[in-house]
Amino acid sequence: MPGPGEAPLMIPLSRRSSWEAVHQLTQTPHRQDSQIRAIRESAAIRRGTRMIKVLSARQVAGFLKGWLPAGFCYREWDVAHLRTPDELRLLRTDADTHADQPNVAFALRWRAIDPLDYDIPTPEAYPGLVAMPSGYRIGSPVLGTGFTPSSQHIIPEYVTASMADLPLSAHASIVGYTPDGQEATLFTYQPEQRGWLRMAGPQWRGLLAGLGSAVDQEYLPLANNDRGTSRLVGTFRGAEYDTVADPPEFRVLAMTRAARYPVESLSRRTRYASWRGVRCTVVSADGGWVRLRLSQPDSEQVVSIGAQCHERGIYEAWAPAAELTDRELQDTPYPL
């Protein structure tokens, strides 16, 4: 069942509008009639909505080193009926070259901080992504209806706003799935300790087999210069602090409980820059080079900066730091 205040996807059916007919409309590229739009808008994200992103073992390893959620994702409620690795393969964003053992699937779960962080990938919002040629993309095409391609299911999909990294909420988790549909929490995110705590016991070691050294570590700390570049910042009594998201609560990031004051304002701070006229978010830096991610991917921008598709919807390239223009830290304020 959805959480308090959550709205399930609403599909009005009748003799004239069967499930099969609605499903066909959701799978018709660029179809944006009023019926499909109304159905899609019924699947709204609210503060605290449980989100999910299906991962490969390569992506799990990345998150354990500091990656943040970006690109395509789903409301957990909309995909709760998919329980086995075979079923969850539909939602994967990684390339087939990173295929894992077929009897294992992984996913990242977190809670939405604010609806402002998510977009519906329609032709109006992301025209280049919808029109991306097959040779330039990984995974299934973006239909533009707001639903993921599927021959059996009607599943609303989302992208993070501008394809930017989003700060993880407290108690985010990485879970594993077995062929019989069992689910195990493998790791939980500890924001005050800046790391992941392994939760899986000996009976789940098979799920961890492809994750390298994570099998033997109880705690995996994150480096201060981690891959993610979006930060959650808040103010308390006029001073600015890094902030922990624990919807509906937001507090100062502090090791001691006594210092975890509730913040009075809240924003997501993300780094942006332009290169060769292309607007990007800054993902990481290494010496005189900066890793950029396209905010509005299209085929011309991909060619212009030599971007590579790393997962469905995510296009990144390395650029000389000296050639970047329009650098800025952009704050997205959230209402409290």
Predicted regions and their residues:
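Short, surface-exposed polybasic-aromatic patches that bind anionic ligands, especially phosphate groups
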Residues: G3, P8-L336
